[in-house]
Amino acid sequence: DPDDFVHVWGMSKWMSLYEQMCNEIPNVVILASNEEMVAHMRIANWKAPIYNISGLSFGKEEVQSRVEQKPFMERKNRVVFGARWDQEKQPQFFMDMITKFKEKHPETEFAICQGGPLRSNNDYYVKEAKYLEKQGLLTIHENLKKNDYYNILADSRVLFNCALQDWTSNTVSEADALGCNVLFPAYRSFPEVFANDHTRLYVPWSQDDAMAKLELLLSKPSPSMGQISDWTNGTIDRMLDIMTGKGEQWRRDGSHYRTPVSEPKY
């Protein structure tokens, strides 16, 4: 993965040795979180059987029990960025879009939500974000506890993602479970996560397409809202099925292991 922090920041040598060690352990079964991860592991010549569980472990009911949700049309006209502010998450794309979108829709609020202080592996992005905040274009929420973040999501309309380095994300399940629209690039595993829903996936890296879809998703809830979190809510069940020999449909062996890539999972 050319954009993964393990590769970019010089950790690939020791990580590759660790993976080689795991690859030699007998009776290991690999549970990958998506079809693209399966492909990377197959290319790396993993010997163990590989299964695609198609999602991260997620408890929808537990997340929803933490906060009170507002009806969509009573929520703030707010777009949330919930990923790290590191360069592989493409914060510049988000900030450029904010500047352009606000010219036409000055009433829209854009927010960065972070569990600690706003930081990045490139300080320029932190300085630029703080500059936009001073200009009144962006709000930075720092040092959030999980429930604080959930309360913001439950009063927002769109969670936006523009990451180069992302495979599947708990942030999308959280936002979807809390009644927030989600808008992600049609990149890597996200077509699988979104079951190829073109209304919530934009052309990477087209600001025009992202903004056109953002306008629509700010105006009304997606008819598919809740389906992503329903699907990831079953990830643990899929894992248990595989471990007990009942999940062979998720095994990715042989020359046709890429066939299911285009098939919607739900």
Predicted feature residues:
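Conserved donor-binding/catalytic core segment of Leloir-type glycosyltransferases
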Residues: 70-89, 95-98, 102, 111
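Short hydrophobic beta-strand element within catalytic cores of glycosyltransferases
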Residues: 181-184
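Aromatic "clamp/platform" in nucleotide-sugar-dependent glycosyltransferases that forms part
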Residues: 163-165
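Membrane-proximal helix-turn-helix segments that form the acceptor-binding/catalytic region
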Residues: 9-30
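A charged, aromatic-enriched C-terminal amphipathic alpha-helix characteristic of glycosyltransferases
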Residues: 219-266
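Glycosyltransferase donor-sugar binding loop
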Residues: 109-126, 140-142
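Short beta-strand->alpha-helix junction loop in the catalytic core
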Residues: 36-37, 52-66, 116-117
